[in-house]
Amino acid sequence: MSFFTMCVLAAGIGMALGTLGTGIGQGLAVKSAVEGVSRNPGASGKILTTMMIGLAMIESLAIYALVVCLIILFANPYKEIALELAKTVAK
């Protein structure tokens, strides 16, 4: 398996795991907020504001995962080393 194939697989798996955690976290946050509003409708404004801030912080996990995966795919610092190693092995 080549270096670039492993980079593509790592980026795909990393993005899948990052978005899986984000989806689960956001689902749990919304579930808790809905339960809180149903128990105390008078506090809905404060609960929803806090939930939105929390969702933004949870969503940052997916953004960080995307950035790392894009770095792995397009700006990999080990690309030159891998190409030199492949040329050396080919000789």
Curated annotation (Swiss-Prot):
UniProt entry keywords in alphabetical sequence: ATP synthesis, Cell inner membrane, Cell membrane, CF(0), Hydrogen ion transport, Ion transport, Lipid-binding, Membrane, Transmembrane, Transmembrane helix, Transport
Chain ranges passing through the membrane: 4-24, 53-73
Family annotation (SUPFAM superfamilies): F1F0 ATP synthase subunit C (SSF81333)
Membrane topology listed for this record: Multi-pass membrane protein
Localization in the cell: Cell inner membrane
Cellular component terms per the entry's GO annotation: plasma membrane; proton-transporting ATP synthase complex; proton-transporting two-sector ATPase complex, proton-transporting domain
Subunit details: F-type ATPases have 2 components, F(1) - the catalytic core - and F(0) - the membrane proton channel. F(1) has five subunits: alpha(3), beta(3), gamma(1), delta(1), epsilon(1). F(0) has three main subunits: a(1), b(2) and c(10-14). The alpha and beta chains form an alternating ring which encloses part of the gamma chain. F(1) is attached to F(0) by a central stalk formed by the gamma and epsilon chains, while a peripheral stalk is formed by the delta and b chains.
Main function: F(1)F(0) ATP synthase produces ATP from ADP in the presence of a proton or sodium gradient. F-type ATPases consist of two structural domains, F(1) containing the extramembraneous catalytic core and F(0) containing the membrane proton channel, linked together by a central stalk and a peripheral stalk. During catalysis, ATP synthesis in the catalytic domain of F(1) is coupled via a rotary mechanism of the central stalk subunits to proton translocation. Key component of the F(0) channel; it plays a direct role in translocation across the membrane. A homomeric c-ring of between 10-14 subunits forms the central stalk rotor element with the F(1) delta and epsilon subunits.
NCBIfam families: ATP_synt_c (TIGR01260)
Family: Belongs to the ATPase C chain family.
Protein name: ATP synthase subunit c
